[in-house]
Amino acid sequence: MYHVIAATTNPAKINAIKLAFEQVFGKDTFDIEDINVDSRVPQQPIGNTETRTGARQRVMAARQVRPEADFWVGVEAGIEDDMTFAWIVIEHEQIRGESRSASLMLPEQILKGVREGRELGDEMAFLTKIDNIKQKGGAIGYFTDGLLSRTSVYQQAIVLALVPVTHDIYKQLNKKDDE
């Protein structure tokens, strides 16, 4: 059984990890332990690079805390221009997989608050009057009327980030690189 470390305590992100690992590896093949680690980027990362760095640093911190695990998963949500998205970083042994989620265009009234230094989740909670919306469907769930959610969008990106770990061609290429 695989031991998976979720470098987050956010239920929406943990559920996305669970669903993606079930899709790829099957039920009852892993257990997930969530841990709170610092991304070492601002609470609301701005830009592609800062967001990706946050996901990578979450994985690095999680590996230090739980070096005995089989997988370490970092999910970092960010904003670039007028879009929200997330970077997923997964490490297994010496292999790293990364993927960026789909993006959602945000309305100007939300972006204004973010530019003033507030988190997207806080702005969404204020606008929608939904407490802790970021740990539920998030902006994605709200604006798509539940057709998508943070969990569903992140789940797809997690499956894609697992490809270098699970696909034979990647494994063969990694072996050649090591020789």
From Swiss-Prot:
EC nos? 3.6.1.73
Name under which the protein is recorded:
Inosine/xanthosine triphosphatase
The record's Gene Ontology biological-process terms are: nucleotide metabolic process; thiamine metabolic process
Keywords from the named record: Hydrolase, Magnesium, Manganese, Metal-binding, Nucleotide metabolism, Nucleotide-binding
Q: Which residues bind substrate?
A: T8, T9, N10, P11, A12, K13, E68, A69
Q: Which cofactor does it need?
A: Mg(2+); Mn(2+)
Catalytic reaction(s) noted: XTP + H2O = XDP + phosphate + H(+); ITP + H2O = IDP + phosphate + H(+)
Q: Which Pfam families match?
A: NTPase_I-T (PF01931)
On subunit structure and binding partners, the annotation says: Homodimer.
Biological role:
Phosphatase that hydrolyzes non-canonical purine nucleotides such as XTP and ITP to their respective diphosphate derivatives. Probably excludes non-canonical purines from DNA/RNA precursor pool, thus preventing their incorporation into DNA/RNA and avoiding chromosomal lesions.
Q: Which GO terms describe its molecular function?
A: ITPase activity; metal ion binding; nucleotide binding; ribonucleoside triphosphate phosphatase activity
Similarity remark: Belongs to the YjjX NTPase family.
